[in-house]
Amino acid sequence: MIERSHHELRKAFGDLLQGHVCKFAASVFDPISVRMASDLGFEVGIQGGSVASLQVLGAPDIALLTLDEYVEQVTRVGRASQIPVIADADHGFGNALNVMRTVSELQKAGVAALTLEDTHLPARYEEQSPVLIGEEEAAAKIYAARFSRSDDSLSIIARTNVAATTLEDSIARTAAYEKAGADAICLVGVKDFHHLAALTEHLTTPIMLINYGNPALCDVEKLSAANVRIVVNGHAPYFSAIKSIYQALREQSGSQGPELSLPELISKYTRVESYREWTKTYLKVGHDSPCGVTPRGPQLCN
């Protein structure tokens, strides 16, 4: 088998963005899962930051993971992958200068693309999440990311949460990110095709959706026609693995341990209640989410 180089995988991802068909990204998290994804016909994968947080820390997705810890996980995937892999680079692990370091490290790890989001992370004292950073600061991160890549085929994807602000602000933000040279725009929180059209009619840059399996946005032909090239439907493979591990350990132990649902398993073994209490105590922020204390939506989705 002739293996494709990281540069070739990046070129393949660029071709996908410039194509005419929407592709669904496989949620991958280790060498085995990315090889499975390739064999099952996926043309692109994504290493979710929330999944890496679970793997490394057993913690909710609240920006506790360090850059080095994330890069270690991505490197393991990058070594084995023969499909392009997108890295979830969160907020770039800091300001625009931190973004430059993040791009350099993830490029060496072998990713084909990375997303940079405009969410303010980690959450600040007494700050109700999610809060977006300023448009100019976010655009500066895109400029810095493009400047710091040594392989121009590495795609920089600007990510924004449209549910965290107004339609008008989202339009202004995505226009600024396109002007800054983002290779694609990633949207979180899109409601339906009407909402998608309103958000993207001013853009020529390819679109990526974090969709969570939204039934109102599942028509591949319509997605393709709307210039959507990548859809991420959450990280079901890893969560299914958690459920299977618990069941297998129950059987091996011969224990009469309780039958726990997936949300119950996640809550118990990521210590969600403890993090919620610590957040209230030390950040003076209350959280009502039943899935966790993540500032970016349901823990079970991303």
From Swiss-Prot:
UniProt-recorded Gene Ontology molecular function terms: magnesium ion binding; methylisocitrate lyase activity; oxaloacetate decarboxylase activity
Residue sites binding Mg(2+) per the record: D88
Cofactor: Mg(2+)
Residues annotated for substrate binding in this entry: S50, R159, H235
Keyword Acetylation part of the UniProt annotation: no
Alphabetical list of InterPro entries matching this protein: ICL/PEPM, Oxaloacetate_deCOase_bac, Pyrv/PenolPyrv_kinase-like_dom, Pyrv_kinase-like_dom_sf
Pfam assignment, any one: PEP_mutase
UniProt keyword terms in alphabetical order: Decarboxylase, Lyase, Magnesium, Metal-binding
Enzyme Commission numbers on file: 4.1.1.112
Record-level GO BP terms: oxaloacetate metabolic process; propionate catabolic process, 2-methylcitrate cycle; pyruvate biosynthetic process
SUBUNIT field: Homotetramer; dimer of dimers.
Function recorded in the entry: Catalyzes the decarboxylation of oxaloacetate into pyruvate. Seems to play a role in maintaining cellular concentrations of bicarbonate and pyruvate.
Stated family: Belongs to the isocitrate lyase/PEP mutase superfamily. Oxaloacetate decarboxylase family.
Name of the protein in question: Oxaloacetate decarboxylase 2
